[in-house]
């Protein structure tokens, strides 16, 4: 079940994910998938253009990895790879994309409009070569790759992100380490999923809770900052997508958490 393939772009789609989590947590584990070889890149598919950033990729990954269920990571997801920029239908290999292009043309669309219509959801977006370096063919091969290399490979690649402690790649490593840690692996594997703050339109948030711990996962998908009131003072900040690692919590009265656009936090309460 490609849970996250249902989308996070609006309240209705987020509610679909929540309903599925609540329904299935008593029976087993869902497969939580943002992208695979038959779908476009998750950052490009599920996030608005203002969120096509390292922060957006980290935010999406936080939800994917910490929902109840089995998270699957597809090659390139861990560095935030995005859909390619396609200039011609001849650049595609996928027969379905070519078929959709011809259907669009027969329906009266121009070459440019037909290309735009079919390229956004083309599975070839997830089949471009893995971006290892900023060198020739993104370091994937010295030969001729089966598809063109995404033009953003000089900015998004493993080599650059290995050297950046705040990169998407190193954030995913921290995220996975928390999920697999002796202290939290039972919680994130078997813990209950409890949605919260569903009246705040831009925020998707939930608790993962077991008999001894309660952890809040909250993400702001909106373009502007948003705030929520915490049920208790934080016991521990486990992770934040902010480069400085800080979390904005006002503790002058009831603790209030403020999330910037595309910010996600993991907080033990």
Q: How should each PLM-predicted stretch be described?
A:
Residues 10-27:
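Glycoside hydrolase catalytic-domain groove-lining segments
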Residues 250-269:
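C-terminal beta-strand-rich structural cap/linker in extracellular carbohydrate-active enzymes
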Residues 29-51:
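Active-site clefts of carbohydrate-active enzymes
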Residues 1-12:
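Single conserved hydrophobic/aromatic residue that forms the stacking wall/gate
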Residues 225-243:
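Beta-strand-rich binding/interaction modules
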């Amino acid at each position: 079940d490609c849970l996250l393939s249902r989308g996070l772009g609006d309240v209705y789609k987020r509610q679909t994910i929540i309903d599925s989590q609540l329904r299935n947590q008593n029976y087993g584990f869902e497969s939580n998938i943002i992208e695979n070889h038959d779908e476009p890149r998750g950052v490009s598919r599920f996030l608005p253009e203002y969120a096509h950033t390292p922060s957006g990729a980290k935010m999406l990954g936080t939800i994917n990895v910490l929902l109840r269920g089995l998270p699957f990571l597809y090659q390139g997801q861990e560095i935030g790879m995005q859909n390619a920029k396609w200039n011609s239908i001849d650049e595609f290999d996928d027969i379905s994309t070519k078929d959709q292009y011809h259907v669009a043309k027969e329906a009266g669309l121009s070459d440019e409009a037909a290309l735009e219509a079919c390229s956004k959801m083309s599975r070839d977006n997830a089949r471009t070569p893995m971006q290892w370096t900023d060198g020739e063919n993104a370091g994937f091969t010295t030969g001729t790759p089966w598809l063109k290399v995404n033009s953003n490979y000089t900015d998004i690649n493993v080599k650059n992100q290995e050297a950046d402690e705040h990169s998407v790649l190193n954030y995913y490593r921290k995220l996975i380490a928390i999920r697999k840690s002796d202290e939290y692996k039972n919680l994130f594997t078997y813990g209950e999923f409890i949605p919260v703050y569903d009246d705040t339109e831009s925020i998707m948030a939930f608790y993962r809770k077991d008999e001894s711990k309660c952890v809040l996962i909250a993400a702001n998908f909106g373009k502007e900052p948003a705030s929520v009131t915490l049920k208790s003072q934080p016991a521990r900040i486990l992770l934040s997508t902010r480069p400085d690692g800080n979390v904005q919590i006002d503790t002058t009265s009831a603790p209030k958490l403020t999330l910037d656009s595309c910010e996600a936090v993991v907080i033990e309460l």
